[in-house]
Structures are given as structure tokens and as C-alpha cells.
Amino acid sequence: KPGVIDTDFIRNHASQFEQYKQLVHDTQWLSIEAQSGLTQQEITQAADVYLHANSVICTWAMGITQHRHSVATIQEIVNFQLLRGNLGKKGAGLCPVRGHSNVQGNRTMGINEKPLPGFINAQEEMLNTTLPQTPGHNVYHALNALIAKKSKVLICLGGNLAAAASDTHKTFQAMRSTELNVQISTKLNRSHLQIGKSALILPCLGRTEIDMQASGEQFITVEDTFSMVHASQGDVAPISNNVKSEIAIVGEMAKSTLGSKIIDWQALIDDYDKIREMIEQVLPQFSSFNQRLESPGGFYLGNSARERKWHNPAKRALFAIND
């Protein structure tokens, strides 16, 4: 129907629309109803609401993210928004709801089992050394590796893996298969009961607690879903002077196992500003990191899709083709 598809947006900003259009035309309603659990009438009613909205935001949470077909499902949500140009338009867009306040920040900092070559290369240049290029495990593969005895040690920095992973039985089995299970935590949780051969519970400071190191009180940074980066500093006295920060715990583990020839781990523990100075050497969007944090509310990292700039070889938004 005329006016249903934003042809100007697709012509100027998108690719693979014709292939996607053909796939949709070839898909039978019986198949759609069987997969969705909804009737054609119900879907048509929802589509009518969408068609009469000038701007639309699609929001989803962990039920989609941890779905068996999560990637394809999210790609279809993106396709849905591309059809009417609901990216890079005021009041429109995509809004994933994460299960933790700093999940997006973790990804930005490179916590990824398959980091991009450019990210690794930038670290190698900064450190003047060679780093491993072999991909690691995502959660699913990590659990399977523990069960198969291909991995022996599990170190969890925060969170509650036993309750958060989607297959509870397999998660329990994997954690109990460990030679060593280390939990760095602010509070007791179910993961501490899945022990394995040996287990350590390492209490750490929470974000509300004062973090005092050699150079004085420290703060960390977080990135929210809307790409805002800001400082987070506790103001409550720690429950004990013996409780260490996450950074101190990880830094001391690294110092004990890797040594300090390449990285001065103790210097990073003593002054978190030095960590941020290293980050800005690897990630250009964090230039003048410490200085920009002085602005009230932090700073905006930017979102290329919001500006309708597409950072891929085609330089265009791509309709995903999922059979």
C-alpha cells in the first residue's frame, strides 16, 4: 500500500530490502501463526497501530536476548523499524533493556569473547606486546567447556550466574564441575552454593561504598543504555576495612599470575585515573576521558544510527535475511 513503507529512507540509507521483501512474500501465514502463537487477525491489528504511529520505539528485555533464536529475532525487530525509517528519527528507535546497569559499558570496553582485530591491535600497540588472538567462550560455550572438563576454573566478577543463565540445570552442573570456582561478590547469592572441587567467595566493595586507595578516594564509570558515560562514587563507609574493590581484587590476581613487566598493576590499583588514561589510548571515543568526566552528568558517547551513519563496509543499514 502507498505510504506503508518509507521508500525515501530505504533508497537513501538501506540495502537488501528487495531480498527481504521477497522472503516476507514467500512466508506463509500458517508458518507465522505457528511460530508466534498469534492469529493473523491479532498481528494485523498490531500492524495497524504501527502504521498509524508517526514514530515508534521498540523495547525488549532478557526474554528476547536469551531466546534460542535471539539474534535472528532482534534482527527482525531492526528490520521492522527500518521499513518505516524509525531509526535516526526523533521519538523513534531501538531500546534494549539490559539485566545490569553497566552491560553496555562492558561491551564498549571490549568484554567480548570475540573482540574485533582493531581492538586487540590497539592494545598491542599501547603495551608493545603480543596478545592472544584466539576467540574465547560466551556463557553457553563456557558452561559446556566446564562440563566437558575442557575448562577447569570459573571466575565470576559480580552477578549471579546460577540464577541468571537460561538453562539452570546445565549451569548448576557446570559450576559443580569446576576445579576452582571463584565468586567476587557484594552479597551472598545462589552461585555460592554451586561449589565444585574448591571454591572462594571474595567479598568486594559495592558502588555505594567509599573506595579508598593509595592516591585517595576513587570513582568508577558506567555507561547507560543511552550511551551516557558518567562517574559513580560511593559515600557510605565500607562494612570492613578488609573488603577490597573489584579493581583491587582483579589487579592483585593479575599481578600475582602475570607479573608487572608489561603492566604496572599496582599503579592501576592505586589510581583509577591511570586505567582511564590507558582506555583512551585504545578507544578514540574516550579521548580526554578523565577531563570529560568533570562535566555534570558525564558525557555522551554518540550513536551512529541516531545520526543515520552506518559503520559497515556498505555504509548503509542492512536488512537481515533470516530463513
Residue ranges and their predicted role:
Residues K1-K90, V97-M278:
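Non-catalytic alpha/beta scaffold blocks inside enzyme catalytic domains
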Residues A267-D323:
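Long, low-complexity segments enriched in small/aliphatic residues
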